[in-house]
Amino acid sequence: MRLVPALLLSTALITQSVQAADINHQGAQELEQKFNSYLPETLAKSGLIKVRPGTADYEITFDPTILLKDVDPKTFSISGLKPLLSMIRPMEDGLWHFSQSADLDVKGQFTAGTEKTDFTYKIDAMRTEGVVDPDLLYFKSADMSANGLSMTSTSPQQSVEARFGSMKSTMNSTRATPETIDIRGNTALNGFTETIIDPSKMKVDISAGTVTADVAFNGLAYRPLQDLVFFILDNVKKDKLLATEQVRLKSLVRANLPMFENLLESIEVANLKVATPTGTYGAETLRYTIDTNGLKDDAKVGFGVTIDKPSLPQGLVPDAFASALPETVTTRISLEKLNLASGITYLIDHANFDTDKPLTDEQSAEAGRIFMPGGAMTIRYDEVSARSAVYDFSLSGTTTVYPEDQGRQNTDITLYAKDFDKTVSYLQKNATTVPEFGQAAFMLLMVKGFAKQTPDGRQMWNITVDESKKVKINGQDLPFQP
């Protein structure tokens, strides 16, 4: 099997597009050959991809059933799959117009261990239209939509039924430099419902008004990634790689570092409700974020969750606690100072892909020390906050831990409290109903003695804990320490 460099295909497509005012059989044959040149030889000859000339477009047929011909029907079976028809039209600027309209209605079964799972997937209608850059082998821009998306899964462990009313998605890619691109995508789904039933017949219903997702890749080095993907496609069915192929794989992985400059992703769920036997829980908004700055040394990986206006079943908590429920809760943390590039390089330099255990215990330990310089992992609290009508707390700072040296850590965080006296007053007023509030009010008044006031009126506590577990608050030693 051979690999055809991406440049060969892109050059051929660009050259052909200039000449392709006429859609003809020769152009279709050349295009089919170029598409199949990226596939393993057996797939290239299987009819997985076929191209024929249409009136104004080339008609490309992708038949997914061919990929399943060698699958044991005792472990996986599916019915309803049919070929997908796409239309590609060359444009004068060397780009390609792409369109596809289809639907999906499949059902099947797979076996994992001794358990069988039945599944169905259905999409009433889906459409994609966009512009493909043949040099990128990716969309320069695209708009996608779908209606009536549903799935079911039934096994001895549980049954799941989920549905989206509709989906719309857009994406754009632009060249940041001659070697890198920026990709931005947005997806919005409406009318989400999901029902889960476990073996005890306990039922959980989940629903959301909308689910939106935004993804941004900045500075993605696309050419090394293309080479790696094609290498994997060319060798995916091999149990073991030849020595020369292992060398090639390692060089491809090195060439992909740091792969991208930044990845930003956010998912927002609006009007979330979770109905359980104990009542309905919910939130006006649930947001999840992830961000990282590439597979490089001194890398950072961040995660975040925000819940706006969470709700609990009526009567689950005493009335006195109602005002204490947060209106907004946010947790954003980052893992910092990770030497990802050096760690990955060590792995590919020392891993033996021909054994079940690619690294020895000593090599695994050394890899851990490389990924985390000095054996330290730094956790940064970018924002941890909780706000309600009676309190407003937030903190930021860092904690450094040493996974191989349990108990060794140091922390430096700063805690802020707005309207502190209002919080204490609320606890004192409700102490007769909730005795624990009285104890909490007493503790807060004690802690206030260590506080500093910021120019905006908030109370502030800088709290440090060193490796000997000695605690300081705003530079003062905490009393009664050993």
What is the role of each PLM region?
Residues 1-20:
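Gram-negative bacterial Sec-dependent N-terminal signal peptides
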Residues 21-482:
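Glycine-rich, small/hydroxylated-residue low-complexity segments
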